[in-house]
């Protein structure tokens, strides 16, 4: 009789499948950004037409496209823009939009409020990039829409569509982190092709900033050479940078134009200057962007001849910089009726200030522990041990000097430990303050002074570093006017690296003696 076979051990169970991408995230409801970059076959159909919905859904998930696809989109859009006139002419019905500033998820909300670009005519007044952290997504999406709807979606240039500001603020850094410097340079070439103004329905002049003392007629705009980096002064600069005077409609001065002290360049224009321009060019009003508005828009004093607001400002970036708490708005003009549609901000993914990575962000935590260990190691030796060791090898004077040197080293490391401790304990305040400065740098001496210095960073120190004026991290910004006042320093034209900064102000006499500056008959009309 055969012996019974021993029971065989059951095979080990197969290893569990790896968790899905992003399953280990702290906030499970937030999906992990796709790692796959869209290819040409995914973005363009067989006829080379962009699949805008595919691109939109991918960008909303924080996805990216192949670099060559990004370059193709930017260059094809730029080719269309180059064929347009410096002052384009558009007809109603149309939806006019103000600043976007890299707030891509709010741009998606804008199209929900304003209507699908497939059946709605749009005019954007510039400032698509900088300050927000999704600027390249805004450019790619708007440029694809321009390729799809070249005769119904129009894009003007803002003061931020230039090399000078995008290098100083965030757009260049964003392009290099998400794509490459090639993509950034392609964007700059495309920005040089953007028209400067639009004539809406033969009734409204639409522009990013406003008027210039060197522009008297619409033909003066048509003659401008726009295919270049905007200069620090002159009519092209003024179209992008000028503002209505702070007492617009209630001026005490008779001067139509005065130096723009807020921007550090260009001019303030007043109510009589606007009325004179409107009358000379048979227009109803000027529609512009360039300034944040609490309600998303502002209607200025009415013209005495037409009874219509002489000037309208529209701003389409809600909760600007995540601190303004403002509404955004778009202007819909149809059948000689103007409607304002407001909307609030939408949730968006979080980026550390200035695109900081997690390793840089965690450095204060690591640094505090390392310096703490160094302080403890150096603090082991007592004063008696230092003096005893010194007596064996040196005279009393040398021992005292050596003791002082070691004490200085301990104090230096202790100071470094305090800096890292402040960085760790006040990390949120530090990141907030750095994120609100265009250079990403803290005022000198803030960290070394400890927590109290950080919490009471002075107006003078912050101004010296071009940070938000008077910002104190523990202080919560409570109103739109407060946020706008604190951010005022960032509204100025930044200093130029390659030349002495022009004050931007030419006297009117100088302006009139250089009438040909910034103009040329060889530009697109």
Curated annotation (Swiss-Prot):
Its cofactor is Fe(3+); Zn(2+). Residues 417-424 are annotated as: Autoinhibitory segment. The active site is at 160 (proton donor). Its EC number is 3.1.3.16. InterPro entries: Calcineurin-like_PHP_ApaH (IPR004843), Metallo-depent_PP-like (IPR029052), MPP_PP2B (IPR041751), PP2B (IPR043360), Ser/Thr-sp_prot-phosphatase (IPR006186). The keyword Iron applies. It comes from the Eukaryota. The modification Phosphoserine is found at residue 479. It is found in: Cytoplasm. Residues 402-416 are annotated as: Calmodulin-binding. Disruption phenotype: Knockout mice show reduced body weight, independent of changes in muscle weight. Reduced slow and intermediate program type muscle fibers in the biceps, triceps and soleus. Increased expression of fast program type muscle fibers in the soleus muscle. Calcium-dependent, calmodulin-stimulated protein phosphatase which plays an essential role in the transduction of intracellular Ca(2+)-mediated signals. Dephosphorylates TFEB in response to lysosomal Ca(2+) release, resulting in TFEB nuclear translocation and stimulation of lysosomal biogenesis. Dephosphorylates and activates transcription factor NFATC1. Dephosphorylates and inactivates transcription factor ELK1. Dephosphorylates DARPP32. Negatively regulates MAP3K14/NIK signaling via inhibition of nuclear translocation of the transcription factors RELA and RELB. This is Serine/threonine-protein phosphatase 2B catalytic subunit beta isoform. It comes from Mus musculus.
């Amino acid at each position: 009789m055969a012996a019974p076979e021993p029971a065989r051990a059951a095979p080990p169970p197969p290893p569990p499948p790896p968790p899905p991408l992003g399953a280990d995230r702290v906030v499970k409801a937030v999906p992990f950004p796709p790692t796959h970059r869209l290819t040409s076959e995914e973005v363009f159909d067989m006829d080379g037409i962009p699949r805008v919905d595919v691109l939109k859904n991918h960008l909303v998930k924080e996805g990216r496209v192949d670099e060559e696809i990004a370059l193709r989109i930017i260059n094809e859009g730029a080719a269309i823009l180059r064929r347009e006139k410096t002052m384009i002419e558009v007809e109603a019905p149309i939806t006019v939009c103000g600043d976007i500033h890299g707030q891509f998820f709010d741009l998606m909300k804008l199209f929900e409020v304003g209507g699908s670009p497939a059946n709605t005519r749009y005019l954007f007044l510039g400032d698509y990039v900088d300050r927000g952290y999704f600027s390249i997504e805004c450019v790619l999406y708007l440029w694809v829409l321009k390729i799809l709807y070249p005769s119904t979606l129009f894009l003007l240039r803002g003061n931020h569509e230039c090399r000078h500001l995008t290098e100083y603020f965030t757009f260049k850094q964003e392009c290099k982190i998400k794509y490459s410097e090639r993509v950034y340079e392609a964007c700059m070439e495309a920005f040089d092709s953007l028209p400067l103004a639009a004539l809406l329905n033969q009734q409204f002049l639409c522009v990013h900033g406003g008027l210039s003392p060197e522009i008297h007629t619409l033909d003066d705009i048509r003659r401008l050479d726009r295919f270049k980096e905007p200069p620090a002064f002159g009519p092209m600069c003024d179209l992008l940078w000028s503002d209505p005077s702070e007492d617009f409609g209630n001026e005490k001065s008779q001067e139509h134009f005065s130096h723009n002290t807020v921007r550090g360049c260009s001019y303030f224009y007043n109510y009589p200057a606007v009325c004179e321009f409107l009358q000379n060019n048979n227009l109803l009003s000027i529609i512009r962007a360039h300034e944040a508005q609490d309600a998303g828009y502002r209607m200025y004093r009415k013209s005495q001849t037409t009874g219509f607001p002489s000037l309208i400002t529209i701003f389409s970036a809600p909760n600007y910089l995540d601190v303004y708490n403002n509404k955004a708005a778009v202007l819909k003009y149809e059948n000689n009726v103007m409607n304002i549609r407001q909307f609030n901000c939408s949730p968006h993914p979080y980026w550390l200030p200035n695109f900081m990575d997690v390793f840089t962000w965690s450095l204060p935590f690591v640094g505090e522990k390392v310096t703490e260990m160094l302080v403890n190691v150096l603090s082991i030796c007592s004063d008696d041990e230092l003096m005893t060791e010194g007596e064996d090898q040196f005279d009393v004077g040398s021992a005292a000097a050596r003791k002082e040197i070691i004490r200085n080293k301990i104090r230096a490391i202790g100071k470094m430990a305090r800096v890292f401790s402040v960085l760790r304990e006040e990390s949120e305040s530090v990141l907030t303050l750095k994120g609100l400065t265009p250079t990403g740098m803290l005022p000198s001496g803030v960290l070394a002074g400890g927590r109290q210095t950080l919490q009471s960073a002075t107006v003078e120190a912050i101004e010296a570093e071009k940070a938000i004026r008077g910002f104190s991290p523990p202080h919560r910004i409570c109103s739109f006017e407060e946020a706008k006042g604190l951010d005022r320093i960032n509204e100025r034209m930044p200093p130029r690296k390659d030349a002495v900064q022009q004050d931007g102000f030419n006297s009117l006499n100088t302006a009139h003696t250089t009438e040909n500056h910034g103009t040329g008959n060889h530009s697109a009309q």
